[in-house]
Amino acid sequence: MDATLQKYIDKLNALNFKEMYEGDFFLTWDKSDDELEAVFPVADALRYMRENNISTKIFESGLGISLFRDNSTRTRFSFASACNLLGLEVQDLDEGKSQIAHGETVRETANMISFMADVIGIRDDMYIGKGHTYQKEVAEAVTQGHKDGVLEQKPTLVNLQCDIDHPTQCMADMLHIIHHFGGVENLKGKKIAMTWAYSPSYGKPLSVPQGVIGLMSRFGMDVVLAHPEGYEVMPEVEEVAKANAAKTGGSFTKTNSMAEAFKDADIVYPKSWAPFAAMEKRTNLYAEGDADGIKALEKELLAQNADHKDWCCTEELMKTTKDGKALYLHCLPADINDVSCKDGEVEASVFDRYRTPLYKEASYKPYIIAAMIFLAKVKDPQATLKALEERGIARWFQK
């Protein structure tokens, strides 16, 4: 067997992830340490095989269904790529063109679209208290449908971003970090600064910063959450980060100083997000149909944002990081000064210097999603990876 693939299989052999089989992937903190760590070697193995022209199709037919309730480029194409890598066709559910627009229930829709579906990926991140709840409702509906004999199989649900977490993004970020620092074992004690940064828009989801502090604190890292006063994230996610840090020997601290967060940081992740309290209020206003209230809130939040234009990832701040060479992360697209906006999250020179690593960071997401699906659909991942290599079907046939 190929030595590199054997290395990935050996990593899996040391982990207990049996509960992932026939499961879903909602929040990273729902998973055990071993379950999270299993995703990484599977993602690496799938990537390695594709790079070496080995087909990784475990399905001869089947659907991967995507539902995006917010705009998406990277995650939309990553989900489609992941499904295709494993042999699934992708069908995007357009709610506006379905019977959902005419009052069809979640239970009915979930079952009607899932007769031949093996996975459902959902992005629902815009309204606090809604996205994760909706994803769970869909998962419960198809589980019951399978139990009742309506569905031949239970589709796996993958969270492509909700109001609480963005696991496919944060796991891709983590795999990028693991490769950058040479292994999971080298992350303990590394300082990561998850910092708010200015954006001319006001309503960016909380799920990325929440996902980052909820995941990175699992690996013994020193996680710093920095933001201006009033830009707090969900308190329950902060509690998750605190508990993780206490368990792993790392730390979780908060500051209202971007400079303090950047000082001696090994990794920086400057990104805008909307205040938790404001997003809660926004959700309630939409529920009440209060158009005037929504406009007033938008005006208030834009003015609040404008008071913090100095929260920008600059060359000067980057010089204060560990040896002036911190790894710069972003989920993309970034608000780049004098490129995508006048004032934004990052100076153009900083972004340009890290452009290639940023694109590589994004490139892990299709494989992370594929690994999540693989672990949910394959009872013996190690044996299946070995069989795929032994089968030796070329992904791209050439004479």
Which residue stretches match the model-derived regions?
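Glycine-rich phosphate/diphosphate-binding loop of Rossmann-like nucleotide-binding domains
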Residues: 69-81, 178-292
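Adenosine-phosphate binding glycine-rich loop
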Residues: 321-399
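Phosphate/diphosphate ligand-binding glycine-rich loop within oxidoreductases
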Residues: 57-178, 336
